[in-house]
Structure formats: structure tokens, C-alpha cells
Amino acid sequence: MARSIIAVLPAAGVGSRMQADKPKQYLTLLGKTLLEHTLDVMLSYPAVSKIILAVSKDDPYISTLSLDPKIQLVEGGTTRAESVLNGLNAIAEKNAWVLVHDAARPCLQHADIDKLLAIEDKQGAILAIPVTDTIKRADNQQCIVKTEDRSQLWQAMTPQFFPVDILRDALSTGIQQGANITDEASAIELAGFRPHLVAGRSDNLKVTRPEDLALAEFYLTRNKL
């Protein structure tokens, strides 16, 4: 049976580090919100059959967007993990795999999705880039304790690609155990799996701080040329 590919976008966060008057996914670049740019990437990728968007119960902005019929809304949770799990629980398709992608990561390119979908190992895979900067470990006083060996360190990105049933079980168990689940792969790791690292691109940035907006606008403009 062929795999069905479904995208889940957790978009219930408030993005406090942006210091903006609205959640960062609703900030506007080039005439569209960050969320719309991100949705456009998934909507235009032929293999993605459906997009599940997890938004806050009291989100006042989502109703202002014109959403494609392929997009299904679900209520987000209080954490990213809960939002993703709510999205997974809305998937009834058999043999489904999920691409979990950050709503505020609008510069993703289809070529990177191609590389993820080439992975058939049920341990799954994530986009990531090797760490190139020197990494320092700090103490509670923000003083350097040691310099880490970066030779085997990677910076995790999204999308993260897993079989729906495996990720659903891993997230559910992790949440019940009170685990610190910072991305989907961390839940998969706790379940005993070893996801593949697929080399991505540094321009697939997550808009987190105000200075990221100009860089995202540059990449989006370049990608449309």
C-alpha cells in the first residue's frame, strides 16, 4: 500500500521573543502572513494530500485567512507536543506518514521535502544542518564551562518525517511521562528509535526574533525568482 503524506503544522504558539503585537505566524511579509507562506509550500507540493493546522482555541486571526480546502483545522494544545498530537489524532488514513513543520519556517524548498520522502525506514528522518559555530556550555552565571566538540552536532530543523502511528504513540507516551519534548524527534528518540539526519539548508530558517524577518523576506524573494 502506498504511503499517504500528510502535513501537520503546529501554529498555536504566541512567539513572545518576537516582541510583536500578534503571534509571529501572523506577521506579514511580501503581502502574506508567515503562516500563509509556509502553507503555500506544502499546498504546492504534489505528494502532500492534506494539511492539518493546529491553532489556539481563541485564535482571532485564523478566520481572516482564506484557507484552501486541503487544510483542516484542529485545536492546539498548551505545548507544541500537544498540538502535534492533536493533529495526529485527526488522521484516519492507513499507512500515513506525517511531515511536521514549523508554521514560522516559510522558506522551505521542495527539494528538501524530496530528500525526506526518500527515507522509507520507519525510524523516520528530520532535516538538520551540521553545527558550524563553536559551541560553549555555560553555567548558571553565564560563564563558559567548556567548549563542546561540534564534530557530531547537528541543528535540528523541520520538516520532521515519521509514520503517523509511531509518532502518535511516542508523543502520547512522552507527554504522559512529563518528558521534555522540544521536537518530534526527541519523542521518537525516547521511544527507542534513531531517526535519520537529512542535510538541509541554512536558509530554511525559523523566524524567532525581529531581525529574522528581513532575512526571511530576502530568502522568500530570492526563491520566487
Curated annotation (Swiss-Prot):
Catalysis: reaction(s): 2-C-methyl-D-erythritol 4-phosphate + CTP + H(+) = 4-CDP-2-C-methyl-D-erythritol + diphosphate
Enzyme Commission code(s) on record: 2.7.7.60
Encoding gene (name): ispD
UniProt keyword Nucleotidyltransferase, yes or no: yes
Protein task: Catalyzes the formation of 4-diphosphocytidyl-2-C-methyl-D-erythritol from CTP and 2-C-methyl-D-erythritol 4-phosphate (MEP).
Annotated site location: Transition state stabilizer: R17, K24
Site (Positions MEP for the nucleophilic attack): R150, K206
Signal peptide coordinates: none
Highest taxon in the source lineage: Bacteria
HAMAP family per the UniProt record, alphabetical: IspD
Protein name: 2-C-methyl-D-erythritol 4-phosphate cytidylyltransferase
Record pathway: Isoprenoid biosynthesis; isopentenyl diphosphate biosynthesis via DXP pathway; isopentenyl diphosphate from 1-deoxy-D-xylulose 5-phosphate: step 2/6
Biological-process GO terms, alphabetical: isopentenyl diphosphate biosynthetic process, methylerythritol 4-phosphate pathway
Family: Belongs to the IspD/TarI cytidylyltransferase family. IspD subfamily.
